[in-house]
Amino acid sequence: MRMFFDGREMGVSNKNEIMLAVDNLVALHRAGRTVWQEVDRDMQIREKNDVKRRNREMKRVHNYIAKQSPKREFESLFMQAFPYFYEQGLNCEQAEAGTAGESEHMGYCHGTYNHHSVLVCGTADARYIATINFEKYHIGNQLQDLYYFIRKTVEKNGYAFALLTAILERYQQGIPLQQMDVAYICGLYRYPEKFYKLSNQYMNGSKTRISPKMVEKLNRIMEEEEKKQTLLEKLSSYNISKK
């Protein structure tokens, strides 16, 4: 059975709607945790964050491009950027190996919770949020949903640290967070997600003609890297327990 909602996508620059989306995520996670604990505890938990596999895929793309001669603009830029981003991936792999298994945040996860999955419905007097796009719904660490929402939303707002902390504090009003949870989110964010996805896009796309947009995307990733690292530096020293 399908349900249809008369609404629009959440305004990714509208702070009020962002906070409504966080409240909605809290409700989703509470329900998802209860169902998993009381009904589906024996169901398989998805591997939390397969960094090792992703790193292998990035290395495979690197090895493929290394053999190309002559190299086109995207391929040359990729080879220049690869050592920096691959090192980030390896650091994340080592950090992941040292993390504990099951977390108190285990439960059903949305999988792709961002502004495209949140509809603002109703009128100004009777507004409500609807959640869509459950294709990647699974059992896992629900903090991955929170991280994904933070990353997508913060990057659309110029890597604003104040917005990131506002999201964390709003989430904590409904589901308590500890310092280790902030460290976990920070660890997820350190992975070079955009570079990894672009490498996959290259590998799965046409090699006959590489779109100029690929070069634009890679340049943008490198240009935004300083903002990302500044944000992560602030997040790593952020104390959630004092909020």
PLM regions: where:
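ATP-dependent phospho-/nucleotidyl transfer catalytic cores
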Residues: R8-S13, E38-C109, A166, E216-K217, ...
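Active-site activation/catalytic loop segments of kinase-like enzymes and analogous catalytic loops
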Residues: L143-P176, Y189-T208
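Helix N-cap / loop-to-helix initiation motif
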Residues: L177-D181
